[in-house]
Curated annotation (Swiss-Prot):
Protein name stated in the entry: NAD-dependent histone deacetylase SIR2
Source organism (scientific name): Eremothecium gossypii (strain ATCC 10895 / CBS 109.51 / FGSC 9923 / NRRL Y-1056) (Yeast)
UniProt-recorded Gene Ontology molecular function terms: histone H4K16 deacetylase activity, NAD-dependent; metal ion binding; NAD+ binding
Statement: the UniProt record of this protein carries the keyword Transcription regulation: yes
Residues at which NAD(+) binds: 248-267, 330-333, 458-460, 483-485, 500
UniProt function note: NAD-dependent deacetylase. Heterochromatin component that silences transcription at silent mating loci, telomeres and the ribosomal DNA, and that also suppresses recombination in the rDNA and extends replicative life span. It acts as a NAD-dependent histone deacetylase, which deacetylates 'Lys-9' and 'Lys-14' of Histone H3 and 'Lys-16' of Histone H4.
Reactions performed catalytically: N(6)-acetyl-L-lysyl-[protein] + NAD(+) + H2O = 2''-O-acetyl-ADP-D-ribose + nicotinamide + L-lysyl-[protein]
Annotated Deacetylase sirtuin-type domain residues: 223-514
Binding site for Zn(2+): C358, C361, C382, C385
Region entry Disordered, spans: 1-73
One cellular component (GO) term of this entry: nucleus
EC number: 2.3.1.286
Main location: nucleus
Entry keyword Magnesium: no
């Protein structure tokens, strides 16, 4: 057995030794002590860092045989008929990796989570192996290494293109032969007869990378194998009793309210404020230093009064069907209340414009009372604190305006900072640096355990802790994303790309339900279509809008 195989066998023996990190299992390599070769291997393992891994499971070619076993609606991964076996090209003498399909990769990931590390390694790896088996197993789990030196070394030993997610064979010669890994003779002293296609440092790196890949699979959610089509979603939505809906800025853009992170979003519009980070507009420390930074641009995100989108009404429809467990919204526009969603069914994770409070005396008032001042780009002041503000800080301007045509700097003395924010009324929006509302923490723990369907709409899931809700929901609960762009750092079972209102109308049409919105009669008549982009991902669109968009783009591009 080669030394790389020996080191991996040590890893296989030690898979039951683990540490608990935030509820996730991390496997450790259990090396034998006593021999100099094992000590050398241990030092090499400790000195070698794991590579950066890219998840490429979605890049694998899809095979739609759907022969996976389903028992009581739960996917049971298949045990491989035999461990991985590499072949060799008869002409080049290079190893040939077997092809990997997306189905193969998903089954391997599910097998690891279902049966654990020890049984996974025993089932997928032969007793005699070399480092190339480890490389192939990493790819089978859906990961691609980024270390160029390591990839170059592997490429020299194999016929396949190792830089892509798909194990496509380079060259045209189909003649291959099954081979066993190189072996060390019994008389060969351990440590002196290293015989492996890769150098020992590369073999050690691969072992580290395999452990890292396995740890990531064990600690993250894997998509359900029996929930990936529109029909699956429609059927589940009809039968669900406790739907958890997580919404973001994308559900309000049809009303003219900008999102935050797109090229035309809010953050791209505030680059002229001289901030190191556009998100500092919502930084509590900066607001207390200079509230004019926020009030100069607050009108851009001020919600329209008593208006709401068809998507808001789509959530109301789910509520009216008795299916809505809770709507966790990251939006601050409070449009859910205008749509008729009950207060007890809404958690405004980042606060809202619904109310406002004095930062000094904490007097609370309806947010609408300061809307006109926000529109006029004035800093709203508390009537109770205003006399003291005038007495203590008579020279402080109450305008968010400018000095010599330039935006006022928020880098001033601490006394000036205190005076600028004294008695200022702030919308009850959760700024960066503030705790989330108590109702979030009160409800989320029980809601994630009770829900039977999670729908995330119009969000990029970039802001914690709300973004972690997808990882808190039990793994067997289907997760659906409705958004303009895919969210690659989460494992949604079904992704519906498109405009939120169009997707909502399409789903309502398929369910035979009516959305309680004034535009529903027109939306109901639209011939909304879809294209399947890949397994579990669809593009939903209105052909009329698409044609108009294409025409507009051609007109812009015309000389």
């Amino acid at each position: 057995m080669s030394e790389s195989a020996s080191m991996l066998q040590g890893s296989k023996r030690g898979t039951d030794s683990s540490v608990d990190v935030g509820g996730a299992k991390r496997t450790k390599v259990d090396m034998d002590d006593g021999s100099s070769s094992n000590n050398d291997e241990k030092e090499l393992l400790e000195a070698t860092k794991a590579d950066e891994l890219d998840e490429v499971v979605d890049d694998y070619a899809e095979q739609n045989d759907h022969s996976a076993q389903e028992v009581a609606g739960e996917y049971v991964p298949k045990k491989p008929e035999q461990p991985i076996m590499l072949t060799k090209d008869s002409n080049s003498g290079k190893y040939v990796f077997p092809p990997i399909s997306k189905e193969d990769s998903l089954n391997a990931r599910y097998f690891l989570k279902y049966h654990g590390s020890a049984q996974f390694l025993d089932s997928y790896l032969p007793e005699d192996l070399n480092s190339l088996y480890v490389f192939h197993l990493i790819k089978l789990l859906g990961f691609q290494l980024k270390d160029r030196e390591l990839l170059t070394a592997v490429q020299k030993a194999v016929q396949n293109d190792v830089t892509s997610g798909v194990s496509s064979v380079v060259g045209t010669n189909p003649m291959v032969e099954r081979v066993s890994p190189p072996q060390l003779s019994a008389s060969t002293p351990s440590g002196d007869g290293y015989d492996d296609p890769l150098e020992k440092k590369h073999a050690v790196r691969l072992i580290k990378d395999l452990q890292k890949a396995m740890n990531k699979v064990l600690s993250t959610r894997i998509r359900l194998a029996n929930f990936f089509t529109l029909d699956h979603f429609i059927s589940k939505l009809k039968s669900a009793k406790k739907v958890l809906v997580l919404t973001g800025a994308g559900i309000s853009t049809s009303l003219g309210i900008p999102d935050f992170r797109s090229s035309k979003g809010f953050y791209s519009q505030v680059t002229n404020l001289g901030l190191d980070d556009p998100q500092d507009v919502f930084n509590l420390d900066i607001f207390m230093e200079n509230p004019s930074v926020f009030y100069t641009i607050a009108e851009k995100i001020l919600p329209p009064e008593h208006k709401f989108s068809p998507l808001h009404s789509f959530i109301k429809m789910i509520q009216d069907k008795g299916k809505l467990l809770r709507n966790y919204t990251q939006n601050i526009d409070n449009l859910e209340s205008y749509a008729g969603i009950f207060k007890e069914n809404i958690v405004q994770c980042h606060g809202s414009f619904a109310t406002a409070s004095c930062v000094t005396c904490h007097l609370k008032m309806p947010g609408e009372r300061i809307f006109q001042q926000i529109k006029d780009r004035e800093i709203p002041l508390c009537a109770y604190c205003y006399p003291k503000r005038q007495e203590e800080y008579p020279t402080v301007s109450d305008d968010p305006g400018t000095k010599n045509g330039q935006q006022s700097s928020h880098n001033s003395s601490s006394i000036f900072h205190m005076s600028r924010s004294f008695g200022v009324i702030k919308p009850d929006i959760t700024f960066f640096g503030e705790a989330l509302p108590l109702e979030f923490h009160t409800n989320i723990r029980q809601d994630v355990l009770q829900c039977d369907l999670l729908i995330c709409i119009g969000t990029s899931l970039k802001v914690a802790p709300v973004s972690e809700i997808v990882n808190m929901v039990p793994a067997h609960v289907p997760q659906v994303l409705i958004n303009r762009d895919p969210v690659k750092h989460a494992e949604f079972d079904l992704t519906l790309l498109g405009l939120c209102d169009d997707v909502a109308a399409f789903i309502a049409q398929k369910c035979g339900w009516d959305i309680p919105h004034e535009n529903w009669p027109q939306l109901k008549q639209r011939n909304i279509q879809y294209d399947e982009l890949e397994r579990g991902m669809y593009y939903v669109y209105d052909p009329v809008k698409e044609q108009a968009k294409d025409t507009g783009q051609r007109q812009v591009q015309a000389p």
